Amino acid sequence: WAKRSDPDGRVPIVAELLSQSNEILDDCVFKEGNLPTGERVVIRTGLPGVYWRALNQGIPSSKSTTAQIDEACGILEARSEVDKDLAMLNGNTAQFRLSEDTAFLEAMNQTQAETMFYGNPGTDPKKFLGLAPRYGDLSADNAVNILNAGGSGSDNASVYLVVWGDNTVYCPFPKGSKAGLTHEDLGEQTVYNSDGTRLQAFATRYQWKNGLVVKDWRYVVRICNID
């Protein structure tokens, strides 16, 4: 408590030294998915054949080829439990809980931004597939959009150029759900400590359902191995 109050017993404004500027969350396009679990997209994989013809000659019919892909959304969730008596010590319960909310909101933002780049269901099935695994193989079909800067260090960086749009790259949220981060005040509850003892606490639930769809791989370029 002493670290979370000023000499007058009030809750001060906490210096958010761990905060980050995640412009990608402001830049990306959010769109309601067509599935309760995410988005089903149809991607064109081949163009129809077209022909030059001469007079009195016919041409064969042709058609394009497509593929269906289901992009699943991930569920990012956190729960805050603040000791009721601790929150009431300074006489401003709402302000104390708000100072705790700020930390959770920042953590949710940072995790979403990180997953948008590095999420990999192959190593963690609960996450959605991010940009780096999609554009991480220089021998893949989309390698034409991966530019190798040639760095050989152990801490190389990448730059991603993304054209956001409903038909290019966007972030779906499950059909019938809310976009973005939701905040639910669960009120006063009896909670358990790690030693099994109980106490009264104010509980808050945070949730963010989100995914990533690259409908047209040509609208993302990765410049990798920047030393």
Predicted features along the sequence, with ranges:
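N-terminal low-complexity, intrinsically disordered segments
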Residues: 35-67
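Core alpha/beta structural scaffold of self-assembling particle/tube/pore-forming proteins
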Residues: 1-26, 39-42, 64-227
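Short secondary-structure boundary/capping segments within folded domains
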Residues: 29-33
